[in-house]
């Protein structure tokens, strides 16, 4: 029988199962309803016949048994799929555990870790279970015959202890290159192939069997029971990896089923702290850890605990109301709607759109302010600081002036008093001859005209008045 025929029969079987499921539920519900009504009428005394009541009771029992059996069968046949989902969840839990170790700068040991080794052993047990059953149904041939040497190495059992794997016998010095998480992912892929092969062989045997063989059916359910037990063991590995000792409740399982598409699991601060402390303890047992690494890891663990909010505050949403003052004006003013609380007067603002003339004037004044008046708002503060600095440096100024007069007097060979008289005479002579006249005053209009294109506003009276108000006194600039 070729592959196309097998797929066609599988599709036909699926269609028949979908079409007959509603019919089975309808028959079971009808039988249960008739039996319940008959028993109720018999108890009330309206029916005196005992035989119909007994038959109705038997029908009720049979209908209930069929319904429970159908539900149990439906749950058991999904064991393989649930086991694959549990393997993926366990892999995500182990990966999350490694992320916690990395977050506190602690390397999670890749070799001989109990959780990952336990997961690998359980996966190999599931593969062996499916391989054994496939051989019994397929004349001793399985996909195992196509194993490569690498796959045979990671799937083989130890010769010393059959509960251990062969890769666990590798010495620790040679085991640094062995990543057991990658081995676990490879084993999951191998199990998926064996599960597909086992499902195909079981369906072909049931379809080609001329008579109903109860032995094969019982063997099939026995295999599913073994796989279900392995699934529960993998679930315990997941809880151990995430430090969740209790099983999920019914509502939590529903939420977990809705969130199963998430790649990473959410952990609380307690689980993160427990994993971080366990990582520190494992590194302390090794000889390669230093005191600075442990101190840094403890500090990062403290930050994890401190970052958890004790009482999370609800986020206040701000309602925004958009109002248009004028239909012709495209400018929009955004106003935040309050929550009924008292608003200070300083917090109330009224915005009005600018006209075209105001915009032009504002742009020109902005250019002028950037060119000439930059930093003028802090001139008063700067003047105050400058005055304080002069007072502090006044003793140094007097001392330097005294030392300068002493040096000049020594250079000219005269007394300091005579040197002061000579300086006064030279000053008076310069004033009389006109050499000591003050230079031309600074013309700021010319400087403004030569600056960045603001000569159009150089003769503006408002602009000149504003400059005059911002002028600094000469006694400050000394």
Curated annotation (Swiss-Prot):
Q: Which residues lie on this side of the membrane: Extracellular?
A: 46-52
Subcellular localization(s) per the UniProt record: Mitochondrion; Mitochondrion outer membrane
Q: Which GO terms describe its biological process?
A: chromosome localization to nuclear envelope involved in homologous chromosome segregation; embryo development ending in birth or egg hatching; homologous chromosome pairing at meiosis; microtubule cytoskeleton organization; vulval development
Keywords (A to Z) from UniProt? Membrane, Mitochondrion, Mitochondrion outer membrane, Transmembrane, Transmembrane helix
UniProt feature coiled coil, ranges: none
Where is the chain membrane-spanning? 25-45, 53-73
Q: How does it sit in the membrane?
A: Multi-pass membrane protein
Major place of residence = mitochondrion
Q: Which GO terms describe its cellular component?
A: mitochondrial outer membrane; mitochondrion
Cytoplasmic compartment: which residues?
A: 1-24, 74-478
**Which purpose does this protein serve, as stated in its record?**
In the first mitotic division in embryos, required for mitotic spindle alignment and asymmetric cell division. Required for motor-driven chromosome movement and homolog searching within the nucleus, and subsequently ensures homologous chromosome pairing during the prophase stage of meiosis.
Q: What is this protein called?
A: Spindle defective protein 3
What is the primary gene name for this protein? spd-3
């Amino acid at each position: 029988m070729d592959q196309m025929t097998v797929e066609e029969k599988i599709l036909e079987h699926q269609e028949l199962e979908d079409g007959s499921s509603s019919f089975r539920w309808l028959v079971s519900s009808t039988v249960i309803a008739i039996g319940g009504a008959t028993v109720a009428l018999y108890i009330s005394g309206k029916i005196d016949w005992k035989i119909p009541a007994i038959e109705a009771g038997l029908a009720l029992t049979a209908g209930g048994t069929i319904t429970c059996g159908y539900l149990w069968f439906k749950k058991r046949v999904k064991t393989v799929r649930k086991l694959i989902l549990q393997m993926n969840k366990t892999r995500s839990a182990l990966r999350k555990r490694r992320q916690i170790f990395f977050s506190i700068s602690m390397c999670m040991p890749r070799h001989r870790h109990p959780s990952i080794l336990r997961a690998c052993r359980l996966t190999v047990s599931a593969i062996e279970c499916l391989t054994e059953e496939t051989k019994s149904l397929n004349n001793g041939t399985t996909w195992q015959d196509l194993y490569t040497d690498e796959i045979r190495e990671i799937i083989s059992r130890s010769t010393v202890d059959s509960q251990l794997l062969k890769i666990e016998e590798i010495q620790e010095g040679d085991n640094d290159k062995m990543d057991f998480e990658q081995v676990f992912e490879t084993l999951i892929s191998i199990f998926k192939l064996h599960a597909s092969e086992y499902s195909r062989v079981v369906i072909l045997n049931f379809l080609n069997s001329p008579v109903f063989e109860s032995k094969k059916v019982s063997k099939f359910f026995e295999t599913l029971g073994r796989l279900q037990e392995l699934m529960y063991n993998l679930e315990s590995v997941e809880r151990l990896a995430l430090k969740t000792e209790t099983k999920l409740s019914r509502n939590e399982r529903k939420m977990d089923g809705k969130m199963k598409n998430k790649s990473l699991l959410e952990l609380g601060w307690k689980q993160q702290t427990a994993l971080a402390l366990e990582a520190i303890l494992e590194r302390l047992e090794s000889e390669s850890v230093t005191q600075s690494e442990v101190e840094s890891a403890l500090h990062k663990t403290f930050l994890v605990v401190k970052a958890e909010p004790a009482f999370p505050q609800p986020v206040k949403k701000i309602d925004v109301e958009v109002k248009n003052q004028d239909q012709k004006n495209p400018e929009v003013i955004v106003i935040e709607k309050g929550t009924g609380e008292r608003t200070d007067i300083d917090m109330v603002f009224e915005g009005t759109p600018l006209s075209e003339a105001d915009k032009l004037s504002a742009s020109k004044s902005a250019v002028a302010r950037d060119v000439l008046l930059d930093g003028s708002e802090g001139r008063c503060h700067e003047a105050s600081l400058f005055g304080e600095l002069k007072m502090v440096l006044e003793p140094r100024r007097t001392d330097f002036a005294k030392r300068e007069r002493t040096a000049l007097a020594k250079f000219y060979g005269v007394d300091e008093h005579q040197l002061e008289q000579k300086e006064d005479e030279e000053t008076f002579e310069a004033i009389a001859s006109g050499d000591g006249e003050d230079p031309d005053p600074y013309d700021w209009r010319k400087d403004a005209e030569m600056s960045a294109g603001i000569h159009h506003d150089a003769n503006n009276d408002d602009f000149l008045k504003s400059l005059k108000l911002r002028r600094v006194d000469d006694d400050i600039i000394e």
